[in-house]
């Protein structure tokens, strides 16, 4: 829509009035005085909160963004990153042409990047993929995707890899951030994603943050918590962390614990609830079962690592056995005050204060967590154990009572998880190991039986290892910066990308660390340069239209995936016995079979909105986004993952699934709120066959690496307010760059004094794997206790993941970036 100055000023006033924290909208006066702009809705490009923004376009360029007053999530507010969204697409080094490593006029692994046409790029790329498939088979090709893919980009990638190339070697960077949340949900409830929603914030009495600095990482949700805390004096905020950060400013109770001991604290609270008679017996008896999870499961390291060799259940980390409530009670009884205080460093009075909040039946509790739980060698367990507390007390799936896993990326839920871009998954919580699930996917996709492989492919960490080992030879990376993001860069990621046996393609908008490590770089369109859809942390699916053109030469990731599929005849990638089951596919391309299958191409160009561009639909001659979405949605409709019809999302500010008969669901599993819960049951955890949630008995186990005399400090990595992930977008926004130009090493002043270093002094942060140079910060926003340092990872000039350990949770296969041993050396 086009707003007059008067209308825009009125809208701006409404947005300002909506602020609970006095946020000022940058540039409002200048914009109000300018000529009229064309404004449209879109979800924010950054975190998983899913804020709605109004995007102002003038002369074919995004010139302004501000909070959308009609968006339920943020109610007119945006954080500082959201306010500068208009600048993320206009960095001076934007990629606009494919770049191929060449020497003497042809591709060479040790060549220099040179511009090539899209046809040349795809010719070379297709040659490597075809040769690899012919010589080594589907397990030698792979793809690393993203929780920043749009829904249809992720879905197109799933089809290309798992159906077209018949390879499950597809994984998203959400493996680094949300995999433990997924396995936690699946083990406890049999279905992924939260049962509650953001509306719980306005109904809760207590907020408990477990390893989550919401003040900086989810600031808009933090403003809602702040509003609840300040407007309702009885509300309490508890923050647990391994170091002090900005969320401590609002906290009524703060707990700093020894890394990894959150597991022991969770069991202490469960023990407290049982000992003090606060178990909701009726709820537990009717709606839960108990299991003992396998322990001593290893740390996801290479098989020759001693910690893997000695792990008793490394081969079955997800295993469990049924137990009784009494056996569970006995199991957690060992987690008494003396034992847990010794492990965690937290005094009993603080443990009891926290435990009482969970135990009190009159107190509604929201538990929030993100990377502190998920990036954890026992992250799945941590997720299971916080659910234990809510299930024991019945504080779940009702307004204000919600265990809530926060999401780091804008569509880690909507794309990575729901679409099934993980190496073991298919859409709508289906998995490749289940023959019925494979059969259903093959039916929907019109594929011959046996097309989809039955074994999970290489996950994110394993992909780097297989690249290094020469077992993954044709590899495509889209919408992520994994050479900066992966742990143990020098040991695994970089040697893998530069292995002469590997041909690596990176699609990106800027020359990131990962792009520079590739053999072929493809320039991508981003955000509102294409039509898109994201799914946020509260199950809210949101659409946007293409609002501006991408730079000449750049193409969307969807276009790249689908156009590339035209290069492959079915007989070049499928075995003869498989093709014999569908002889009518002979001579057809993967494009014909996957994307012109009578379903994806059934919506004509005339169904696109004539007020907006749609480059992909124009390129392929049909409304490809709608076709992909509707085919994908057929997986979940009628199975508890119902999505609304495509056109509904362009009209709404997002809808929370399951959407049944046009109505979204705010609280799942609860009678009267969730249409899938049968009348008279109260609660029904229908992801599990028996309709019951699982309470797990799980122990404390130590991390794989702890400080010692040689490496006396814990290292934790993470983010800061001003930058997002690897900083490839935010560091190109001048205002955000100036606000926090470079990473620093936050450390305790007494540690700095003992070492003879002062604030601003250059030091090495060194582990057994590598080191970086950075500067000491003793007065900043983050205040580690003695013996721990914190270094953000946004700075490409300080690759802190040279230092980190590539240990993972053996169930979720997610990396632990929050704890390894380092030493600090004065330069």
Swiss-Prot record:
For this UniProt record, give its keywords in alphabetical order, as a comma-separated list.
4Fe-4S, Electron transport, Iron, Iron-sulfur, Metal-binding, Molybdenum, Nitrate assimilation, Oxidoreductase, Periplasm, Signal, Transport
Where does it localize?
Answer: Periplasm
- Fill in the PTM field for this protein: Predicted to be exported by the Tat system. The position of the signal peptide cleavage has not been experimentally proven.
- The residues that hold substrate are 793
Which CDD domains does the record cross-reference, listed alphabetically?
Answer: MopB_CT_Nitrate-R-NapA-like, MopB_Nitrate-R-NapA-like
**Pfam name, any one:** Molydop_binding
GO terms, molecular function = 4 iron, 4 sulfur cluster binding; electron transfer activity; iron ion binding; molybdenum ion binding; molybdopterin cofactor binding; nitrate reductase (cytochrome) activity
Q: Where does [4Fe-4S] cluster bind?
A: 44, 47, 51, 79
Report residues binding Mo-bis(molybdopterin guanine dinucleotide). Answer: 81, 148, 173, 177, 241-245, 260-262, 371, 375, 481, 507-508, 530, 557, 717-726, 801, 818
Q: Which GO terms describe its biological process?
A: cellular respiration; Mo-molybdopterin cofactor biosynthetic process; nitrate assimilation
| GO CC terms in record | membrane; nitrate reductase complex; periplasmic space
Which cofactors does it use? [4Fe-4S] cluster; Mo-bis(molybdopterin guanine dinucleotide)
InterPro entries, per the entry: Asp_de-COase-like_dom_sf, CT_Nitrate-R-NapA-like, MoPterin_dinucl-bd_dom, Mopterin_OxRdtase, Mopterin_OxRdtase_4Fe-4S_dom, MopterinOxRdtase_cofactor_BS, Periplasm_NO3_reductase_lsu, Prok_molybdopt-oxidoreductase
Q: Which family does it belong to?
A: Belongs to the prokaryotic molybdopterin-containing oxidoreductase family. NasA/NapA/NarB subfamily.
Q: What does this protein do?
A: Catalytic subunit of the periplasmic nitrate reductase complex NapAB. Receives electrons from NapB and catalyzes the reduction of nitrate to nitrite.
Subunit details for this protein? Component of the periplasmic nitrate reductase NapAB complex composed of NapA and NapB.
Protein name in the entry: Periplasmic nitrate reductase
Gene name, Swiss-Prot/TrEMBL: napA
């Amino acid at each position: 829509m086009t707003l007059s100055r008067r209308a825009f000023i009125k809208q701006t006033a409404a947005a300002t009035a909506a602020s609970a924290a006095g946020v000022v909208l940058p540039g409002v006066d200048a914009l109000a005085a300018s000529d009229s702009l064309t404004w449209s809705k879109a979800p924010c490009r950054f975190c998983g909160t899913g804020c709605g923004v109004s995007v102002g376009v003038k002369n074919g360029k995004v010139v302004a963004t501000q909070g959308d007053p009609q968006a339920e999530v943020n109610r007119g507010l945006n954080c500082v990153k959201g306010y500068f969204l208009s600048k993320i697409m206009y960095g001076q080094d934007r990629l606009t042409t494919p770049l191929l490593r060449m020497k003497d006029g042809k591709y060479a692994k040790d060549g220099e990047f040179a511009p090539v046409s899209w046809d040349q790029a795809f010719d070379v790329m297709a040659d490597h993929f075809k040769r690899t498939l012919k010589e080594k088979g589907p397990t030698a090709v792979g793809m690393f995707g993203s929780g920043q893919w749009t829904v249809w980009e992720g879905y197109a990638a799933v089809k290309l890899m798992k159906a077209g190339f018949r390879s499950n070697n597809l994984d998203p960077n959400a493996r680094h951030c949300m995999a433990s949340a997924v396995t936690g949900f699946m083990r406890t409830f049999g279905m992924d994603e939260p049962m509650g929603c953001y509306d719980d914030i306005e109904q809760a009495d207590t907020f408990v943050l477990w390893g989550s600095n919401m003040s900086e990482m989810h600031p808009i949700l933090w403003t809602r918590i702040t509003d609840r805390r300040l407007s309702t004096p009885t509300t309490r905020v508890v923050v647990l962390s391994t170091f002090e950060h900005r969320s401590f400013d609002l906290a009524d109770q703060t707990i700093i614990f020894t890394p990894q001991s959150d597991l022991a604290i969770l069991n202490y609270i469960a023990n407290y609830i049982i000992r003090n008679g606060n178990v909701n017996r009726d709820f537990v008896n009717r709606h839960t079962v108990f299991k003992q999870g396998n322990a001593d499961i290893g740390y996801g390291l290479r098989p020759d690592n001693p910690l893997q060799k000695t792990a008793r259940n490394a081969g079955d980390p997800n295993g469990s056995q049924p137990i009784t409530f009494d056996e569970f009670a006995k199991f957690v009884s060992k987690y008494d005050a003396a034992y847990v205080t010794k492990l965690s460093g937290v005094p009993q009075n603080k443990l009891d204060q926290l435990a009482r909040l969970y135990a009190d039946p009159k107190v509604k509790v929201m538990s929030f967590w993100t990377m502190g739980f998920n990036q954890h060698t026992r992250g799945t367990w941590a997720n299971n154990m916080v659910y234990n507390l809510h299930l024991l007390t019945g504080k779940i799936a009702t307004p204000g009572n919600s265990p809530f896993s926060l999401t780091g990326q804008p569509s880690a839920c909507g794309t990575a998880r729901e679409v099934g871009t993980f190496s073991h998954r298919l859409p709508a919580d289906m998995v490749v190991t289940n023959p019925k699930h494979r059969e259903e996917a093959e039916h929907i996709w019109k594929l011959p039986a046996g097309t989809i492989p039955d074994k999970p492919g290489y996950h994110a960490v394993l992909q780097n290892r297989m690249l290094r080992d020469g077992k993954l030879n044709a590899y495509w990376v889209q919408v992520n910066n994994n050479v900066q993001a992966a742990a143990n860069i020098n040991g695994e990621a970089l040697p893998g990308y530069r292995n002469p046996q590997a041909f690596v393609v990176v699609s990106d908008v800027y020359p990131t660390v990962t792009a520079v490590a590739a053999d072929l770089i493809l320039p991508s369109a981003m955000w509102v340069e294409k039509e898109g859809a994201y799914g946020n942390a509260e199950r809210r699916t949101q659409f946007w239209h293409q609002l501006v053109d991408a730079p000449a030469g750049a193409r969307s990731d969807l276009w790249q995936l689908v156009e590339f599929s035209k290069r492959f005849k079915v007989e070049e990638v499928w075995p003869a016995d498989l093709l014999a089951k569908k002889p009518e596919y002979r001579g057809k391309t993967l494009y014909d079979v996957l994307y012109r299958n009578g379903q994806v191409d059934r919506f004509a160009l005339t169904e696109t909105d004539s007020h907006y561009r749609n480059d992909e639909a124009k390129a392929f001659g049909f409304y490809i986004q709608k076709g992909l979405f509707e085919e994908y949605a057929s997986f979940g409709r009628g199975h508890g993952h119902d999505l609304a019809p495509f056109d509904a999302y362009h009209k709404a500010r997002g809808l929370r699934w399951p959407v049944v008969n046009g109505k979204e669901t705010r609280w799942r599993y609860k009678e009267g709120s969730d249409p899938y819960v049968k009348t008279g049951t109260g609660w029904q955890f229908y992801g599990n066959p028996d309709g019951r949630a699982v309470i797990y008995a799980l122990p404390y186990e130590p991390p794989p690496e702890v400080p010692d005399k040689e490496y006396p400090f814990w290292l934790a990595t993470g983010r800061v307010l001003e930058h997002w992930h690897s900083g490839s977008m935010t560091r190109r926004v001048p205002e955000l760059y100036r606000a926090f130009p470079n990473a620093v090493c936050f450390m305790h002043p007494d540690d700095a004094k003992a070492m003879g270093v002062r604030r601003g002094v250059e030091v090495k942060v060194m582990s057994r794997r590598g080191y970086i140079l950075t500067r000491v910060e003793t007065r900043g926003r983050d205040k580690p206790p003695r013996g721990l340092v914190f270094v953000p990872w946004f700075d490409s000039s300080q690759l802190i993941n040279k230092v980190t350990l590539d240990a993972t949770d053996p169930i979720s296969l997610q990396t632990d970036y929050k704890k390894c041993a380092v030493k600090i050396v004065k330069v």
